Regions:
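A short, conserved alpha-helix within the catalytic core of class I
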Residues: 176-190
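Short, glycine-/aromatic-enriched active-site segment of Class I SAM-dependent methyltransferases
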Residues: 202-226
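Conserved alpha-helix/loop element of class I SAM-dependent methyltransferases that forms part
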Residues: 70-93
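A short SAM/SAH-binding and catalytic strip from SAM-dependent methyltransferases
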Residues: 166-179
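Short alpha-helix
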Residues: 225-243
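Conserved beta-strand signature within the Rossmann-like core of class I S-adenosyl-L-methionine
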Residues: 192-204
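Membrane-proximal basic amphipathic "stem/tether" segments
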Residues: 1-49
Length: 263
């Protein structure tokens, strides 16, 4: 298929997803949050954060105004969660959430029974427009969470410094990295069982040959921190090359893809 036709199809797919999400009605909680914080206080704390990336349900019908995949809609985060195939029962499991931002997926892992959850983020986008760990800290307080947080980069990871984790979440980070293979080696070093990875990818070169496109001038979402578009074959190949076994694609649409790989 010609690249120009593929680009048109992908543009249409993204518009369809936006339309479907606009009609989707997720069940939200009207109960108090685990902290027991009253509604007025929750609303005040949510308003203190000028930018929420994740949609987090705080009870009382209050859901933060998330911004997922360019879709500013309260169901965006849950839509991604449904495609990750994260196990419903995480009792006894340790989970690492790389690039956790507001912490939705960290708190979800805790909710599913994970015995330890560590969220890391270096908030490299702070200088552009955002607010560091403020959203995470407020969410943790409202949810009365025990999720740990460390300000760190994926390049900082090592078993000696952070320990090992049964499940590693690596969501929306890979294509922002100048040194993607080094990052995957670091991720592999702290993974005990399984990696779940979501990223932008290059759908235009859907061949068996591993290929990667370098974005020099903010071609993706006009974001100067995006650098790479690996095609599907290349993503599977680099996961194997750093040591992961049986990498597989579990979901993709438009220019986004979700993969699982095993230790």
């Amino acid at each position: 298929m010609l690249p120009i036709i593929k680009k048109f199809i992908i543009k249409i797919e993204r518009q369809i997803v936006k339309i479907l999400l606009s009609f989707r009605k997720d069940v939200v909680s009207f109960d108090p949050p685990p902290s027991g914080m009253n509604k007025e206080t929750v609303l005040k704390k949510v308003a203190e954060v000028p930018f929420w990336w994740h949609s987090i349900d705080f009870g009382y019908g209050i859901v933060t105004p998330g911004h997922q995949g360019g879709i500013k809609h309260p169901t965006g985060t849950k839509n991604l969660l449904g495609n990750l195939q994260l196990p419903d029962d995480l009792r006894g499991k340790s989970v690492l959430d790389i690039g956790a931002w507001d912490g939705f997926f960290s708190f979800e892992a805790e909710k599913r029974g994970a015995s330890r959850v560590l969220a890391i983020d270096n908030f490299y986008r702070d200088k552009l427009e955002h607010t560091g760990s403020q959203g995470f800290e407020i969410a943790k307080e409202i949810l009365k969470s025990n999720v740990e947080f460390k300000k760190a980069s994926v390049y900082d990871l090592s078993p000696e410094k952070f320990g090992m984790f049964d499940i590693v979440l690596f969501l929306g980070v890979f294509y922002h990295l100048r040194h993607p293979l080094l990052a995957l080696e670091k991720v592999f070093s702290v993974t005990k069982e399984m990696l779940i990875m979501e990223t932008h990818y290059d759908p235009y070169h859907d061949s068996k040959t591993p290929l990667a496109v370098f974005y020099e001038n903010a071609e993706i979402n006009n974001d100067p921190t995006t650098f790479w578009g690996f095609n599907k074959s290349c993503l599977l190949a680099v996961l194997r090359s750093v040591g992961f076994k049986n990498p597989e694609v579990i979901y993709r649409y438009a220019d986004r893809i979700i993969l699982k790989a095993y230790k």
